[in-house]
């Protein structure tokens, strides 16, 4: 079977490019089969883009050759790392009749154990890096996202992703990268491009402008390698779980969490999850108890959540963060300070400590019991903050599916409706109370559950992560989700709250509105210089 390309003779340049790629890569790495092409055209929300075919280079040199040829044949290229960009567009290109460049074969890993850095290719997943560190550098820790363990480390960093625990905002801990421009030109940032440089892979900036920022959420080149900071595995890891019963408590609680971040007592991110979000992680919609055409009633949601008997997490918002300590004395002192300042701001608070030996054991067998953790959803957070991959929040994508959650989850092929709205806001209780009611109102009006997450990624800023979750096979739900998304995004922008990450197949930077500077024209000039005769779409 062949792709739809066969039935579009006007796309002659794509045919010529296909033949060229077969010569360079070998026929087995130029994919035209219908089932693969169909998967590349499928996301967790409605899309219309079509794909010509897929190429799978196995080295930076092959990427370079494919890009130079794409420039010659004027073929648009859409790079993907591993394709687990669920909720933001999956593998679907920005425009139709693109050639998808799958970089999963570039899966090299190189660790500097002394300086705690790792250099990876775009095909390296969180799971692969975890296993490599566990076997070869057990003293090192890499922080994980809440997404699939099989998602790409580089892809997440380039698209403004963040992790749980230390080094939360990935991009802030990128030391250097290697990129190939559409012309085939080759770039190494920092000191990496200089011969015999002793701080190659160590220094964030070389001499002159730091060019690595040009490749974050951009189409100016394809990143084939990245060096990222790691952390030392802590001697002690403390987990703090807490919850509140009234939304009004968010005001003082978030301000106090911000103070704890600013003072340095909390180095990790803090997370506050709406009760709807927790319920969706541990169950599916109660079809026999509620009207499926409406948002699940809040009182019923809280009743069902409490029936799950999750210790501490039984409130309207349920929180977690971690403290990483070098000594037991440090751990005990920090615990006492945190309990003193937080206990009056929350309805429930619990903490416990695991030591390095326990973490090492969990790395090899994450099913081992931890006496202080009696529920799997709390155990999952412990593992994530300890840098141990689990399925994270992926099961919540099946909340509105009438079929059971499968053992192997593929959100695209299982027709899970899932759409992320990723908002940046000041880390303050006032802003939380401004945002939350608006999000809840829009979701309720459209019949979706407001699965809100407030995430304190640093001492100044919090991410407000809201997901539209539905079943795509239900007629009209794709359109309803899109309408809710667009209207809510517009309303939040009028309030001063913008998205920091966009679902690429139907959103663009232009959708954020008119700028008050000349960035658009400056970026256009950069693109005109670097993208002559070629077109790379935003890195996925």
Model-derived regions, located:
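Conserved glycine-rich FAD pyrophosphate-binding loop
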Residues: 5-9, 44-53, 75, 80-81, ...
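Short amphipathic alpha-helices in soluble, non-transmembrane regions
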Residues: 17, 69-70, 256-257, 331-345, ...
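Conserved oxyanion/phosphate-binding beta-strand-loop segments in alpha/beta enzyme cores
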Residues: 20-42
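Long, structured ligand/cofactor-binding scaffold of large enzymes
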Residues: 41-140, 151-164
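Helix N-cap motif at beta-to-alpha junctions
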Residues: 58-60, 247-248, 323-332, 428, ...
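FAD-binding subdomain of flavoenzyme oxidoreductases
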Residues: 108-110, 122, 127-263
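C-terminal cap/substrate-recognition region of VAO/PCMH-type FAD-linked oxidoreductases
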Residues: 211, 227-228, 238-249, 253-393
